[in-house]
Amino acid sequence: MELVLLILVASLIGIAFLALQQHYSYWRRMGVREIRPKWIVGNLMGLLNMRMSPAEFISQLYNHPDAENEPFVGIHVFHKPALLLRDPEMVRNILVKDFAGFSNRYSSSDPKGDPLGSQNIFFLKNPAWKEVRLKLSPFFTGNRLKQMFPLIEEVGASLDAHLRQQPLHNERMRCFDLEAKELCALYTTDVIATVAYGVSANSFTDPKCEFRRHGRSVFEFNLLRAAEFTLVFFLPHLVPFVRFKVVPAEATRFLRKTINYVMSEREKSGQKRNDLIDILIEFRRSTQLAKASGIKDQFVFEGDILVAQAVLFFTAGFESSSSTMAFAMYELAKDTDVQQRLREEIKDALVESGGQVTLKMIESLEFMQMILLEVLRMYPPLPFLDRECTSGRDYSLAPFHKKFVVPKGMPVYIPCYALHMDPQYFPQPRKFLPERFSPENRKLHTPYTYMPFGLGPHGCIGERFGYLQAKVGLVNLLRNHMITTSERTPHRMQLDPKAIITQAKGGIHLRLVRDALGV
């Protein structure tokens, strides 16, 4: 009996071994160059052991010797075969030219357990994504941004006042130290609160206010949160079973209550502010009218689908811009010549505008734009993009591969950070060189190698808004202060291995010196 049991166990182990060997030989059988995976974890060991940031992990795959000179390479995300793109023309095909066959992200959250995370425009799948994107687009037109500008600058002026009120740590040097990311997050939180919701968060006077506290909770990465986001992007089918929420439960309750209250009060008063709340109210009215008229098959804009868009605008809006501003402060602190040139540009523009920060004045800052473009090359908010093949038939990769076709459901990853740091596209990639993005040099860039906000129809809908609030914030910061390094400033930036988005490990500690431009 024991011998029979032993033979049975050995047989089962042997069958499992052969099955795994067959499974993980997928790319060899398809005739596709692969990066050899490890069983169970696939090619994700570098991410799972948290010895490197997601940006560095994706670069390691991109630069792997087995991927050299290949337009794409086969990888495994845990058990599942996936494609990692390396050729800019393939990036164009997947993100733009053949978007219809890759219109969904592979990543997703749990529709039941995480309604505000799963139903926002970032995670929504077609056709719901297309409907929501179409409805939200008017909020980000040039005319809308023009209407928003006074509200953004009002918060910018509060940032300037907040900094001028800070006690000096050294009277002789007229300076004080701070953590740049937190300062910038206070600013962007207040901007989003007033521009999107029509409320004052007052983060500068109360850094622990509910808006800031709940915003922080979404992007505060510990070991558990890191593991959960890894599932969202690489093993999304397991997310419902682990009950992970992109938007934590407490933040969900606060934001749902706040947004529904603001919408209700706005409808009662009839007031119009041309903000996101007005757009969401119009969404709801269109659904109500359609129901009253007996119109069927119209996408339903009500309940959490409305709140989810407001939540995404809040969380993504404050996080990406505050990170960009903080990384810009870090690079400016290390490069005094670039900072001096920028401050001179700001001073000249302020003189031209009579000392007022206006939309025209902000739009005239060409060197500021070059700096932000270079910062976003070095520190893109998301280090990679993900797509899922949604084509009704297998997608051919010709002329890049004559035989292999991408099956429906296969994940595809675009390594933004790795492309940004590839010396064949951006020489001396680790060096901060805003001149890369001068109007003349931009024309020389290889298309589809720069994508800090994504590309194609799925590109970030709030990109122009993000640039605008970052520029207003930096102008008000540099108007009366110069940025320098301190004893706590790292010589080389280290990215947080726990954060799926691009964040500095341990914060960005800098020093501000009182030095008014005199305008």
From Swiss-Prot:
A biological process term (GO) from this entry: response to insecticide
Membrane topology: Peripheral membrane protein
Binding site for heme: 460
Listed GO MF terms: farnesoate epoxidase activity; heme binding; iron ion binding; methyl farnesoate epoxidase activity
EC number: 1.14.-.-
Entry keywords, A to Z: Endoplasmic reticulum, Heme, Iron, Membrane, Metal-binding, Microsome, Monooxygenase, Oxidoreductase
Pfam families: p450
CDD domains noted in UniProt: CYP6-like (cd11056)
Compartments, record wording: Endoplasmic reticulum membrane; Microsome membrane
Gene Ontology CC: endoplasmic reticulum membrane
Cofactor: heme
Keyword Secreted appears in the UniProt entry: no
Family: Belongs to the cytochrome P450 family.
Additional remark text: More highly expressed in DDT-susceptible strains (Canton-S and 91-C) as compared to the DDT-resistant strains (91-R and Wisconsin).
Function: May be involved in the metabolism of insect hormones and in the breakdown of synthetic insecticides.
PANTHER family named in the record: CYTOCHROME P450 (PTHR24292), CYTOCHROME P450 6G1-RELATED (PTHR24292:SF45)
Protein name: Probable cytochrome P450 6g2
Organism: Drosophila melanogaster
Upper classification of the organism: Eukaryota, Metazoa, Ecdysozoa, Arthropoda, Hexapoda
